[in-house]
Swiss-Prot record:
Disulfide partners: none
The protein's assembly and partners: Oligomeric complex that consists of at least the alpha, beta, beta', gamma, delta, epsilon and zeta subunits.
Subcellular localization, as worded in the UniProt entry: Cytoplasm; Golgi apparatus membrane; Cytoplasmic vesicle, COPI-coated vesicle membrane
GO cellular component annotations of the record: COPI vesicle coat; Golgi apparatus; Golgi membrane; perinuclear region of cytoplasm
Keyword field: Cytoplasm, Cytoplasmic vesicle, ER-Golgi transport, Golgi apparatus, Membrane, Protein transport, Repeat, Transport
Name listed for the protein in its UniProt record: Coatomer subunit beta
Recorded topology in the membrane: Peripheral membrane protein
Biological processes annotated in GO: endoplasmic reticulum to Golgi vesicle-mediated transport; intra-Golgi vesicle-mediated transport; intracellular protein transport
Database matches in Pfam families: Adaptin_N, Coatamer_beta_C, Coatomer_b_Cpla
Keyword Protein transport annotated: yes
HEAT repeats: 59-96, 100-135, 136-172, 244-281, 300-337, 339-375, 397-434, 441-479, 550-575, 576-612
Domain of life: Eukaryota
Lineage: Eukaryota, Amoebozoa, Evosea, Eumycetozoa, Dictyostelia
Miscellaneous: Brefeldin A does not induce dissociation from the Golgi of the beta-COP and presumably the other coatomer subunits, but DMSO does.
Amino acid sequence: MSALTQSGSIEKPCTILINYDKGDPPQVNEFKQNFEHGTTEQKIETLKKVILYTINGEPIPQLLMPIILYVMPSNDHTIKKLLLIYWEVIEKTHLGKLKSEMILVCNSLLNDLNHPNEFVRGSTLRFLCKLREAEVLEPLVPSVRSNLENRHAYCRRNAVLAIYNIYSHFDYLIPDAPELIYNFLLQEKDASCKRNAFIMLFNCAPEKAVEYLSSVLDEVPSFGDMLQFIVVELIRKVCKTSPSERSKYIKCIFTLLNSSSPAVKYESAGTLLSLSSAPTAVRGAASAYIDLLCNESDNNVKMIVLDKLIEIKKNHSKIMEELVMDILRALSSPNIDICKKVLNIVLDSVTPKNIDEIILFLKKEINKTQSKEFDKGLEYRHILIRTIHVSSLKYPEVLGNVVPLLMEYLGDSYLPSAVDVVIFLREVVETYPSLRELIIKKLIENLSSIKVSKVYRVAVWVIAEYVTCLEDLQYAMTSITNDLEELLKPKQTEEVILETKAKVKIEKVSIQKLIADGDWYLASCISSSLTKLFFRAEQLNIDNADSNKLKAQVMMIISVLINLSKASQVSTSKSAYERMLSCIQVLIDSNATIKKIWLQDCRDSFANYLKYLLIKQSENKKKTEKEVLVKPNNIINIRQLKSKKAFGPVDTEDDLIKAVGNTGEANKDQNEYSKISQLSGFSDPIYVEAYVRVHQYDIVLDISVFNQTNDTLQNVTLELVTLGDLKICERVPPFTMAPREKTSAKASIKVSSTDNGVIMGTIAFDIAGSVSSMSDKNCVILNELHIDVIDYILPANHQYTDVLFRNHWLEFEWENKIPVNTNITDLVKYVHHISKVTNMGILTPEVHLSNDTGILSANLCAKSVFGEDALANICIEKQADGKISGYIRIRAKVQSIAVTLGEKIGNMGMKA
């Protein structure tokens, strides 16, 4: 909707909005007849139509007197209710003066304020809250005051609201209103009446509200939740302006933490944190938040509370460590996103004191996921495994209990869970030698249960790399041979492949099936692991006879795999084929140097990789800790050195923001000004500029219009048109401008998809006093206003996993490939630049983003407010001259978002 506001005036609030298809124009004579001679039902229907016409921009002022004469005297309650709506929506003034007819209306309202029916009284009092005409309100004040003593709470409640409205806008009509309401509050027993009265004092006479609160401070816990909520707000306001009063009210806030109302409990916790940073206060507030987290069913509430707990953890990590077991109770939520946030908090709160309890709790949760009736599914099991993985590596004393548990999930059909387990075992077996023997034995035992190629590859690599005795080595050889049994039978290779495929159709997923289906990378990994097992056996001083037998067995298996790859209908990877051939070659002709490469250098390389990850994690942590929250030249006003006149209510809050380092709003003014667009020139007779406000599904243009001439401009008409998926909801009505006057208008534009849009327009006007002709028509063509798609895109890296990214990458059909063209020379900096430009979140972990190798690949993801997903893959390398080259591929389910993001990157690629 659009509305017009002239300078110096206040836009009238719209309190009623009813959609109505006008159809035929109003029949004024017919309406008059119905009011004058119709039945009560006819009057009701006609009055409804008149109200609807008036609301929708077609007032019928000539019906005012007939309504006063023939409808207003009725005692029907429905008519009285409709009349209150009618008085509310009609124009009650003419040329700034109250219409004479409103005197008659005023008399009717006075009668209704003294009506014997409480509903009529209360409805009339409620209507007075919406009146802004002092001439109408003045004669009604005595009756409004008398209703404070009405026996019915409905009347008293609305009488308080009426006095609140009158005093707020015309305090001279009831100068003693604060004292009146204060005395009323002392005697009142009804909760809703007390709430309204307290709100009135809170906003109009804070000192009276504080006086009342001080007198009943011990009774606050027994108040209703409506009143308690306002009490909390008052305490926050009082303590902000008078810090010395904090100790007086903290006890009250502590008691309200146990309120039965979730809203009161939430506000009390927030207020307590703002009043005190003492451990007792922080612990009490955090406990209240945790109670809400565990007991509230609304997922939105849970997410908000989790954000609050994250904020507490940043400044009071020790306290959160004490409460971590209480937070874990929130894992009972069926929402997976909530569980992820809970586990993220837990990960940062693990200590030597609570690690055993946390691991025990998580083990119980993992066991629950094995039940068929469990709702959360495999993804929940994965994040539990991931949490155990990360937390147990921090405190290795629990690894002995964790490893056997996680081993059970090596054969998990859900890829992320199984991969996480085997990666965890690979890291543990290198970092903690004391656990190697246990892990190797368990790995060999569970080898045949593994169903995922990547997991099997890592598992056989770990076994070959870290096996420590001949017994385990022979056990591993037997296990691998059994897993390849069908492939090793002495038949023609084509028959082997066909029989294996036929057999696995009715069997579960197996390594044989994966190789038969063409996974030659897996075959090459098995070949290299078998080769390493042979070299490891020689290192363990195996007998010559057994050594020759083992070598023959290994070479036979590798030869079979090579022959299978040649006969397969699935094309063999060249690197995999060459890898298998090289294994045969080193087995035939090996020397000390080759054995050192296979047995020592490979392990050293992996150990260096783990050290590199630790260094990167440490560097990222230090960067976070060293982040400067407050610049040294920021000014903090000291209250004691300022005069009272110079001290404003916002100073305290602004100083507090600076003191705690919350500089997120530091550039707010700069961002606000950047959204102002100049639509016409300073030399034009009318200067126009627009401020763009972007909401979730629409855009509101705050348009400022300046008459730069000395003439009165009439029929000033602003016409807007759009390109793209934009739709103007309502036109701005024509208006008149005095010389040198400023006027503002609002236009609402609906956005239906994530696409770049353009708003264009003209502003036409007539000059007052001139003879109307085409030559007198003036028109200013406005500049184009471009709507940026980035305003509707949000990072989604917290919603995506690597597996989900890959699945969506395969599903999404629209792709936009953009060549990299930039003057940035740092690979990591370029990735962050693209993330900032497109508002996409970086899914690739920070530790994997590095300039060391000269090449970099990163995944990014985002989601629009319309639910559209967008994925991006950046593949770049640094050339010899220092420049970056490569491609950015964007994939999306809909074409528009892929195209617009590509255009954004293309336009911004050269900017650092």
